[in-house]
């Protein structure tokens, strides 16, 4: 770089001081991103965006043992080489809607990493938190049967099962997870109580930022514990009345696949000098033990049954053992549930 003397108007002074600094090689970082997985995630997100005419599609892949982020994709996105040029109609319309002096607002919308900065109601994927907490706290009796009549009434409010038109009837805990049966999870939330459920929500990392090494991370939105009544407890139990970021949810569920250990998400695993030699390694960080290894193993079997026998059959891959949980939540707009607007998700291990 070149440093010169200027006057108050920014004009160079002829007899001023001039100093030149040679360019120096910068240091580097080694990311946890797997370029092959990232490529597949980008293509899958684009395909889902087009096929479903979605407003946004988001995908994260994480190694549950280390917290390493292996892929992170979101559509629509932008070209980093031309960051102010919209490459999707959605952003073109957004840019056109702003005056030149306010276009920065549209750019922020385009550049924002929604996987860490936006919250959403997780819907039934959150049932894994309620289910795992219930197993850990032994609030489910061995071989216990639950009954779904299509709805449950809490404090005078009727809460429907998604299949209220054809109730699930008698079902085990495992079948209730497979069926994503709301009334059963209302019952589990009641058995846990507000205090214990909130303890687990906190233990799973859903009340604080994950600490991922990216700027702009948002935190979850949920009721203060003292403000949670029977109705709020019921809806939180099956994933409503709580909003989390995608990175928070995948980190929480990854702990179930990691013998109950919650890891901090990691994006940088090493620093290098200008010749590529590693100067510092970033070790995986265990945040806490959330549940026991035994509970973790039980829940992995339950999650596997969702893919083999439940609502996640579409994710089944011959030759592989997969577990997961589907989720569908009504989109919240201006503080109200919007009719016909949904957030559909799937989380798997």
Question: Which positions does each model-derived feature cover?
Answer:
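Conserved, well-ordered alpha-helix/loop/beta-strand core segments that scaffold catalytic motifs
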Residues: 14-57
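Short hydrophobic alpha-helical segments used for membrane anchoring or interfacial signaling
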Residues: 59-64
């Amino acid at each position: 770089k070149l440093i010169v003397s200027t006057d108050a108007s920014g004009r160079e002074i002829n007899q001023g001081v001039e100093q030149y600094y040679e360019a120096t090689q910068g240091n580097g970082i080694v990311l946890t991103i797997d370029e092959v997985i990232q490529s597949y995630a980008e293509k899958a997100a684009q395909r889902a965006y087009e096929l479903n005419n979605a407003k946004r599609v988001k995908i994260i892949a994480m190694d549950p043992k280390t917290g390493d982020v292996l892929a992170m994709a979101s559509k629509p996105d932008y070209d980093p080489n031309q960051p102010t040029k919209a490459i999707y109609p959605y952003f073109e319309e957004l840019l056109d809607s702003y005056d030149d002096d306010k276009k920065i607002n549209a750019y922020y919308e385009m550049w924002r990493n929604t996987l860490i900065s936006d919250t959403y109601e997780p819907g039934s994927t959150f049932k894994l938190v309620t289910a795992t907490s219930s197993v850990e706290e032994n609030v489910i009796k061995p071989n216990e049967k639950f009954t779904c009549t299509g709805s449950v009434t809490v404090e005078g409010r009727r809460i429907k099962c998604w299949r209220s038109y054809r109730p699930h009837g008698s079902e085990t805990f495992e079948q209730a997870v497979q069926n994503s049966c709301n009334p059963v999870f209302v019952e589990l939330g009641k058995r846990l109580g507000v205090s214990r459920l909130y303890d687990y929500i906190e233990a799973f990392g859903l009340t604080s930022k994950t600490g991922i090494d990216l700027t702009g991370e948002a935190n979850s939105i949920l009721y203060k514990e003292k403000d949670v009544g029977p109705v709020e407890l019921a809806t939180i139990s099956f994933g409503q009345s709580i909003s989390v970021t995608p990175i928070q949810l995948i980190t929480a569920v990854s702990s179930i696949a990691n013998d109950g250990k919650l890891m901090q998400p990691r994006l940088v695993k090493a620093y290098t000098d200008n010749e590529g030699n590693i100067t510092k390694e970033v070790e995986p960080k265990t945040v806490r033990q959330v549940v026991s290894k035994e509970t973790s193993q039980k829940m992995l079997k339950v999650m596997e049954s969702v893919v083999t026998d439940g609502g996640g059959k579409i994710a089944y891959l011959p030759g592989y053992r997969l577990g997961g949980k589907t989720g569908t939540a009504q989109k919240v707009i201006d503080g109200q549930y919007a009719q016909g607007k949904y957030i559909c998700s799937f989380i798997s291990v």
